Design a protein with these regions (language model features):
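Flexible loop/hinge segments that line or gate small-molecule binding clefts
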Residues: 64, 169-208, 318-330
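Hinge/cleft segment of the Venus flytrap/periplasmic-binding protein
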Residues: 41-101, 341-404
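An alpha-beta-alpha
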Residues: 103, 122-124, 211-260, 348-351, ...
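Hydrophobic alpha-helical
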Residues: 164-179, 246, 263-323
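Hydrophobic alpha-helical segments within soluble ligand-binding/sensing domains
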Residues: 90, 147, 201-227, 241, ...
């Protein structure tokens, strides 16, 4: 290990696998987005069959994210975790200090496969930097109150920089805001309601993810085709924006959204929902999902019924990519790259060396297509591994990520 001392106060036992990726869960007071939307259809005219737009929807953010998908990022071509789209640099000279450094990390959780892959990748990034003398980590285990306490505790540990992945947006805002005057804060994955962190690191975002899948279906499904939309749960910001983007696209195209159902990220429930819709409608022409973790279960519902699998979107989990390849699916995999877990460590060191960083560090978020599927399909990696980890050249790969 290149750093002289590394103490992880809590790495949290792996909780039950859930299908949320980089999500926060502050439900709006009006409950917008709650409940099943399977009865949202408003007749054969195709108008607003997807129900009301989420209260999370912000038109300007939607437009900005869709535009960023085609912008050329700056940074090393072979290191997308160091690239940035439309970077607006901030001066960090006031934080410059001599090393070695003590970095601290308040992690929301390691309670799903996406976060587990990211956490392994972050640890490997830390191990590459001999100037990191100590890496102190507290895992909030998906609990807001614990993370608030964790952030306060870390401020008393003599951290040179504090990395935060907040469990939820609004609830963690005061804790992050309170830390900013005391230590440079690097925020990533999920946002909070203050711009006081030195930098906020994230992929393009939920609108881009949702649009990639929905636009694919508008190209692959005939006019009037029946679309089933599968969501995990309401009130989760990045999932709400994924659906908001898809809803906008479906509402503006001649596709028949026959149902919008919540699966709770459960494979068995997903399979049951899809099977019920097959029995009820006979034909489903396209599947849209706000997270790919249950995509294989949805595919299996068609296979069990002896029906061809319609066009659909998944995500960059290996089980879906392998099913796509083996079954020759018509598919796309929007991504929320786990390589973003490398970037906060890099950003913290740049800040402590007085180097500028983007105020909002927008990382590229490339979809996986039929043309590049083979590039991301990794033989020997476990089913729940995420392909866009940016970890292939790191020490310990593939074994530390569960591969062979």
């Amino acid at each position: 290990m290149p750093h002289t001392h590394r103490r992880v106060l809590s790495a949290a036992a792996v909780a039950a696998l859930v299908a949320l990726t980089g999500c926060s869960s502050d439900l709006p007071a009006d409950g917008a987005g709650s409940g099943s939307a399977s009865d949202a259809g408003k007749g054969a005219d195709g108008q607003n069959k997807t129900g009301d737009q989420s209260s999370f929807f912000v038109q300007a953010d939607y437009e900005a994210q869709l535009a960023m998908r085609i912008k050329q990022p700056t940074g090393p071509a072979d290191k997308p975790w160091e690239q940035a789209i439309d970077p607006q640099p901030v001066d960090t000279a006031r934080y410059k200090k001599a090393g070695p450094y003590r970095l601290c990390f308040s992690n929301a959780a390691t309670n799903n496969p996406w976060r587990q892959v990211g956490w392994k990748t972050m640890q490997a990034e830390v191990a590459q930097h001999k100037e990191i003398a100590d890496f102190t980590v507290l895992d909030a285990e998906g609990k807001d109150d614990k993370q608030i306490s964790d952030i306060a505790e870390l401020q008393a540990k003599g951290c040179d920089a504090l990395i935060v992945s907040p469990n939820t947006t609004a609830t963690l805002t005061p804790a992050v805001k309170g830390a900013c005057p005391k230590v440079p804060v690097i925020l990533f994955d999920r946002g909070v309601g203050t711009d006081c962190p030195v930098t906020f690191i994230k992929p393009i975002g939920g609108y881009a993810f949702g649009a990639d899948g929905a636009e694919f279906l508008t190209r692959k499904v005939k006019h009037g085709g029946k679309i089933l939309a599968l969501r995990i749960s309401p009130g989760v910001d990045v999932l709400e924006t994924r659906w908001s983007a898809a809803k906008r696209i479906f509402d503006n195209n001649k596709l028949d959204v026959i149902g919008v159902e919540f699966t709770d990220g459960d494979a068995a429930k997903t399979k049951s929902i899809v099977s019920n819709y097959i029995q009820r409608h006979g034909t489903i022409d396209g599947l849209w999902l706000d997270s790919g973790a249950t995509a294989v279960a949805a595919v299996e519902a068609f296979e069990d019924a002896g029906l061809p699998v319609p066009p659909l979107n998944g995500e960059d989990q290996q089980d879906f990519l392998q099913k796509w390849k083996d079954a020759n699916l018509t598919a796309i995999a929007p991504t929320y790259p786990t390589y973003q877990w490398r970037t906060p460590v890099i950003a913290a060191l740049k800040i402590l060396k007085g180097e500028s960083v983007p105020k909002v560090w927008n990382l590229p978020q490339p979809p996986i297509t039929a043309e590049n599927l083979d590039t991301y399909l990794k033989p020997g990696m476990p089913p729940l591994h995420y392909a866009l980890c940016g970890c292939e050249k790191m020490d310990g790969y593939p074994q530390k990520w569960g591969g062979k």
